[in-house]
C-alpha cells in the first residue's frame, strides 16, 4: 500500500485513468467489430459509414495516448483495405 500522500494520490488517479481508458478501448473494439460485421455482411455502404465513425474513435484514442498512433493507422488501413476488396 502507498505510504506517502503523493503515492496515495497517484494510486487514486491511476485507478480513475484505468477505468476511463478501459471504456475507451471498449468503444474502439465495438467500432471495429461493427465495420467487420458490415464487411462480412457484404454491405459496402454501411461498412464505409461505420469506418468513418471508427476512424474518428481511433484517432481520438490515439491522441489521448491509450494506444500508439501507428496502431490506429494500421487498423484504419486494414479496415479500409477490407472494404475496398469487397468489389
UniProtKB/Swiss-Prot annotation:
GO molecular function: small ribosomal subunit rRNA binding; structural constituent of ribosome
InterPro entries, per the entry: Ribosomal_bS20, Ribosomal_bS20_sf
GO cellular component, one term: cytosol
Bias kind Basic residues: ranges: 7-19
Region (Disordered): 1-22
Superkingdom to which the source organism belongs: Bacteria
Keyword Ribonucleoprotein: yes
Alphabetic keyword roster: Ribonucleoprotein, Ribosomal protein, RNA-binding, rRNA-binding
Residues spanning the signal sequence: none
GO BP of this protein: translation
Function: Binds directly to 16S ribosomal RNA.
Family affiliation: Belongs to the bacterial ribosomal protein bS20 family.
PANTHER family hit by this protein: 30S RIBOSOMAL PROTEIN S20, SMALL RIBOSOMAL SUBUNIT PROTEIN BS20C
Name of the protein described by the UniProt record: Small ribosomal subunit protein bS20
Species assigned in the record: Laribacter hongkongensis (strain HLHK9)
Amino acid at each position: 500500500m502507498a505510504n506517502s500522500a503523493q503515492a496515495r494520490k497517484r494510486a487514486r488517479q491511476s485507478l480513475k485513468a484505468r477505468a476511463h481508458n478501459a471504456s475507451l478501448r471498449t468503444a474502439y473494439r465495438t467500432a471495429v467489430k461493427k465495420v467487420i460485421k458490415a464487411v462480412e455482411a457484404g454491405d459496402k455502404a454501411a461498412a464505409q459509414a461505420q469506418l468513418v465513425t471508427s476512424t474518428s474513435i481511433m484517432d481520438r484514442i490515439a491522441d489521448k495516448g491509450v494506444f500508439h498512433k501507428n496502431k490506429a493507422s494500421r487498423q484504419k488501413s486494414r479496415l479500409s483495405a477490407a472494404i475496398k476488396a469487397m468489389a
